[in-house]
Amino acid sequence: MCNNGASMRLRTFLLHCSLAALLLWAAFLCAQPQASPPSAKTAAKTDDALELVKQGQKLNSEGKQDEALALYDRALQLSPNLFQADLAAGMALDLQGKYQQARQHLAKAIEEAPPASKVQALRTMAVSYAFEHNADEAAKYERQAFDAQYNAKQYADAAGTADELARIYLESGDSDNAFQWYQSGHLTALHQPNLSSAEKDLWEFRWESALARIRVRQLGRSAEAPKHLAAAKAILDKGDNPDQVRFYPYLSGYVAFYLHDYKTAIAELQKGDQKDPFVLSLLAQACEKSGDHAQALDYYRKVLTINTHNPTNAFARPLAKEKIAAVSK
């Protein structure tokens, strides 16, 4: 009986201690400030950061890169792993010619990008190298993008990526690799199931367009370029790709320029897209070759009003900056 009584008293004591501990813990929790769920706070910061990126992109399109970069920096302070902010910062820095700084942001964007945006980030890095005509470095990123698209059976997208790399090679002076990648793009496009005759003609036009530009740049093969130009025109004349007709003056002007027929080049390129920096750059160069330096400078200045981050501007903008800087000295 004594043992039972002692045991009962011990259990009662322990129960009272446990109850007291629970009451103290509850009082402690009640005294703590009620915090918002971390996910809600993070989402709010991300939304604010994305709005800053949007505002920065508008400023960048207006040529206000410094102001845009200030907003991207604020966005990254709010959301340090926001790939859109790093991507946009890299683009703005490329337009300023600050390529090493740009690639630090773009490398971070590639790491941060979700799977659906990885290809975009990779291709943006490739364009960064196109600004310096560094096709081999650009290829490291374009190939990753191409492989991802090809493996996902996104053949039209993969063909576009291959053609983009081919153009970077061509405008960097490597016509052999340009041929290989244009050919890869053409063959990849034909993997698409159930292509219509118009779609087949589209890819044939692009292939003939590529061959015309490649041959006119190759030593000893420039005489072949007009044949491919005529083949491209014949495809357009079938009329099943009317939206491609607007590209023909650029193609014709390009071939004429590299055949040293600057009068024809100017006449054709003036019919082309006057908002395309590469067309404007070719016009400027053709005017220079013709001795019209004032008109050339006018075209170079127009190039610098365009703030897109794509291969055409990557080829045109650095040259325009160089030419304008030379006359400003």
Q: How would you describe each model-predicted region?
A:
Residues T46, P80, P114-A116, Y150, ...:
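Short coil turns that delineate tetratricopeptide repeat
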Residues D47-R74, L78, V255:
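Alpha-helical segment of the N-proximal tetratricopeptide repeat
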Residues L50, Q84, K118-Q120, G160, ...:
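Start-of-helix register in tetratricopeptide repeats
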Residues Q57, M91, V127, R167, ...:
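Residue-level recognition of tetratricopeptide repeat
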Residues S61-E62, L95-Q96, F131, E164, ...:
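Register position in tetratricopeptide repeats
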Residues R74-Q77, I110-E111, D147, L187, ...:
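Conserved structural position within tetratricopeptide repeats
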